[in-house]
């Protein structure tokens, strides 16, 4: 699970605890063959020594990184295929002939605005002028009002509506730390060479876009210095990503009256009133220390410093939707942070806006053309097979009492399953896309529309039929607040799911994804929520202690991994995903053998069923990645890198050793006493 500050400009929802299989992403159009694709293998490597290189080395050599990507793997291949399919759908729409206000008109016009480079370059910074003028005259006491009313401004904190962790049937308002232009606090606080390089690139970026927005050289330098000073103060007060993994620590309900007394410079009653929320008397504060820092900064920083910081956040939010000068400055920063060498083509960048802002509208078109009903039926069957297998694993646990096992079964039985697409599509009739206005102004309207959509849930019962990913998304998730697992249509394709592949391969791929999401319900965060999605302790003290001891050992294993140079993996940050990877593999392997019903599966192309199962899993994570991206993801991504999702996870799994005859002395071998098995 990942806890992430809410930003309206890059998220269409406010979700504190949504857990996805991957954070990242086949121009592949070919159907995956039945049996192992030997072209993916590197036969020069013994599977007993480095299973990842053996299983994926051929693919890695055949697919070197292009300049457009800082990381590219089979997952990204599928994401690229889906992107091409969505592009065909969008370019096939004729917005000029569509009824005004229709989804077709909105999607088509929004995409066309992003593609019109001539107009974007001609307009330059003009779309920012009015809002920047407002920011430039904003007094200290109006900072909070500005944040409440200016769509797209990224500053200080985020707020949004989500299910109450203590009463998951009702929606409540949350406050979360934010306001960091570089995204992660470590970039401000660390002295590593990578962090220092990213800081310098960020300052150069701010200087460039400020001057493009009309600031003089001297004023732009002042803006950079003031912004870095405020953001560094926020970073020092922010919780680390490891600390954010504790949901209880981020649950601090306070009354509005109490907030007004403690944090007088952050007038949250006024803030919410301006957003149309007048009946709020209570707010769940994620990080009180961060809120105290915001209060202190607003009270004590100079008005000019506050204005510069607000302007920097605003310009940065808009930069991707302006002319090439802004785009190039943004990309220069990205090059340093991730190692990417070439910008995405314009059509991909333009497509991401309607795909994100009107995701379900495009999703409806996507499933009509690309998602067969038979895939949904087969997935539902697979999910139930995995549910049964996880129940067997719970029964067989030696470290858990019968009392806690009974509660675990209750939670497993209560899992809600979503496959393919929602039964009810979202209504976008309230969103206005006006091609006469600038691209950025239309994006602001979409941000405002999605913000109001979220706020409309305040103090209402939780809608458990709502989806938190669009159908065309190549991903899957578990949401502990609704105790649901979701598998969008986009991921139900090769290499994850192939109706023509044999069962061993499908269980090794999509089966593991299913098991992964189910296991999230019982990882270090998910286990703290009950069957109804409430933050509640259903464990005996002894069982909780046993779980924590096993989890700590698994975290320590991953902490020992060197990912680049002298940088280690962060096993505590990635703990939930590592637990889910292991659980997914073990449970799916059991489900596969259950499906055989005592029959012996055939050997295909010289590979036994179990060998095909584990090769299928490894091939899902085949990929190449740049060192800068490794360093960036180690800070920001709660998933381990693909290599270690394979090698480090498999080294704890006995059936894998048996499948590939791994013995003491082999590099993949781990002594029984050192293995960690949780679920």
Task: Describe the residue ranges of each PLM region.
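Bacterial Sec-dependent signal peptides at the C-terminal "C-region" and cleavage site
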Residues: 22-34
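Hydrophobic/aromatic-rich, well-ordered segments within soluble, folded domains that form packed cores
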Residues: 40-61, 188, 192-211, 575, ...
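Active-site-surrounding "flap" and adjacent substrate/cofactor-binding loops of secreted or lumenal enzymes
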Residues: 46-50, 54-115
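Short, solvent-exposed loop/turn elements at domain surfaces
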Residues: 59-63, 182-183, 495
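Short secondary-structure subsegments characteristic of cysteine-rich extracellular domains
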Residues: 68-90, 218-237, 506-512, 610-614
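Noncatalytic, helix-rich "gating/capping" subdomain that lines the substrate-entry/channel surface
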Residues: 92-381, 385
């Amino acid at each position: 699970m990942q806890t992430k500050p809410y930003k309206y400009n890059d998220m269409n929802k406010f979700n504190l605890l949504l857990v996805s299989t991957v954070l990242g992403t086949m121009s592949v159009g070919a159907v995956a063959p039945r049996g192992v694709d030997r072209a993916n293998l590197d036969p020069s490597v013994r599977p007993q020594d480095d299973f990842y290189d053996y299983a994926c080395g051929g693919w890695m050599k055949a697919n070197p990184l292009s300049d457009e990507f800082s990381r590219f793997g089979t997952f990204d291949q599928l994401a690229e295929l889906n992107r091409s399919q969505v592009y065909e759908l969008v370019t096939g729409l004729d917005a000029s002939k569509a009824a005004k206000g229709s989804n077709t008109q909105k999607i088509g016009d929004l995409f066309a605005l992003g593609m019109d480079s001539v107009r974007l370059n001609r307009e330059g910074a003009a779309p920012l002028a009015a809002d920047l003028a407002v920011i430039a005259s904003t007094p200290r006491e109006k900072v909070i009002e500005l944040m409440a009313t200016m769509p797209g401004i990224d500053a200080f904190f985020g707020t949004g509506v989500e299910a109450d962790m203590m009463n998951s049937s009702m929606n409540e308002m949350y406050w979360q730390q934010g306001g960091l232009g570089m995204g992660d606090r470590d970039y401000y606080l660390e002295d590593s060479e990578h962090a220092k390089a990213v800081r310098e690139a960020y300052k150069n970026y701010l200087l460039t876009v400020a001057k493009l927005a009309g600031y003089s050289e001297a004023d732009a330098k002042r803006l950079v210095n003031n912004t870095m000073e405020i953001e560094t103060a926020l970073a020092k007060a922010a919780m680390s990503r490891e600390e954010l993994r504790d949901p209880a620590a981020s649950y601090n309900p306070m009354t509005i009256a109490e907030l007004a007394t403690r944090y007088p410079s952050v007038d949250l009653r006024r803030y919410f009133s301006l957003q149309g929320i007048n009946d709020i008397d209570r707010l769940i504060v994620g990080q009180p220390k961060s809120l105290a820092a915001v209060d202190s900064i607003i009270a004590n920083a100079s008005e000019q410093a506050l204005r510069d910081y607000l302007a920097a956040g605003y310009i940065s939010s808009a930069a991707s939707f302006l002319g090439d000068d802004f785009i190039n400055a943004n990309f220069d920063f990205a090059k340093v942070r991730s190692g990417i060498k070439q910008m995405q083509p314009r059509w991909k960048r333009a497509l991401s806006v309607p795909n994100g802002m009107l995701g379900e509208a495009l999703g409806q078109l996507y499933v009509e053309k690309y998602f067969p009903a038979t895939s949904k039926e087969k997935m539902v069957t697979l999910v139930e097979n995995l549910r049964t297998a996880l129940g067997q694993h719970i029964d067989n646990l030696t470290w858990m009492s019968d009392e806690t096992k009974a509660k675990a079964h209750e939670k497993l039985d209560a899992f809600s399953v979503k496959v393919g697409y929602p039964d009810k599509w979202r209504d976008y009739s309230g969103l206005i896309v006006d091609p006469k206005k600038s691209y950025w102004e239309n994006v602001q309207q979409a941000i405002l529309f999605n913000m109001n959509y979220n706020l409309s849930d305040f103090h209402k019962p939780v809608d458990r039929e709502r989806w938190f990913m669009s159908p065309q998304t190549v991903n899957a998730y578990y949401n502990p607040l609704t105790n649901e697992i979701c598998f969008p249509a986009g991921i139900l394709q090769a290499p994850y799911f192939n109706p023509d592949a044999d069962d061993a391969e499908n269980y090794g791929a999509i089966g593991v994804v299913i098991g992964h999401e189910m296991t999230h319900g019982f990882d270090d965060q998910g286990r703290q929520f009950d069957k109804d999605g409430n933050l509640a302790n259903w464990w005996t003290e002894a069982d909780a202690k046993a779980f924590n001891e096993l989890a700590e050992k698994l975290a320590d294993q991953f902490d020992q991994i060197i990912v680049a140079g002298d940088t280690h993996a962060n096993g505590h940050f990635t703990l939930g995903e590592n637990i889910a990877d292991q659980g997914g593999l073990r449970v799916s392997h059991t489900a596969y053998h259950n499906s055989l019903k005592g029959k012996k599966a055939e050997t295909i192309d010289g590979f036994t069923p179990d060998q095909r199962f584990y090769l299928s899993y490894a091939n899902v994570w085949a990929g190449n990645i740049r060192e800068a991206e490794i360093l960036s993801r180690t800070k920001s991504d709660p998933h381990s890198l693909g290599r270690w999702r394979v090698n480090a996870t498999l080294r704890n799994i006995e059936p894998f050793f048996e499948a590939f005859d791994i013995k003491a002395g082999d590099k993949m071998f781990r002594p029984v006493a050192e293995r960690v098995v949780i679920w």
